């Protein structure tokens, strides 16, 4: 994730804001879990050792999550890239195929049958709210099991603690 620089005086960097790792990467860990479909067995974090105040470890880290089936998800989160480039690019490698997602607008496939291009970005917020409302109205369980939500939070908390101690 090429998050771009946000001044360290901004609210997101306050204790109440939680930091960008908490505020953004948690969604990526949740997406990893959805794609892999297996529990996490370990998490490793390597944060930037900065030389200037404009590049801090809590905004610049590589996080690798290892799953029960041997799959792994790696997030490169950085604030030192240019905002002129894509913010979010994901590559999924599996079964001799490659899926590239660009800013949640375009999906390119290699070794698979179809590409997808949207006119606007779709991170699924609207559909998530619809699903939540349907669960409430119909008194159904939420589609994401509690254990998976808790696991995502535990990963996020562990990563946040690691990048804070790297300073």
Residue ranges and their predicted role:
Residues 28-29, 126-130, 156:
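A general structural signal for well-ordered alpha-helical segments in protein cores
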Residues 41-44, 72-73, 98-100, 142-143:
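Acidic/polar loop patches that form or flank catalytic/metal-binding clefts of enzymes
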Residues 18-19, 117-119, 140-142:
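Active-site rim elements
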Residues 68, 132-167:
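C-terminal helix-rich "cap/oligomerization" subdomain common to oxidoreductases
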Residues 52-58, 68-130:
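NAD(P)-dinucleotide binding in Rossmann-like oxidoreductases
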Residues 1-54, 166:
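Predominantly a Rossmann-like dinucleotide-binding segment in NAD(P)-dependent oxidoreductases
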Residues 63-65:
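Short beta-strand scaffold segments in enzyme catalytic cores
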Residues 25, 29, 57-61, 146, ...:
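Conserved glycosyltransferase catalytic-site signature
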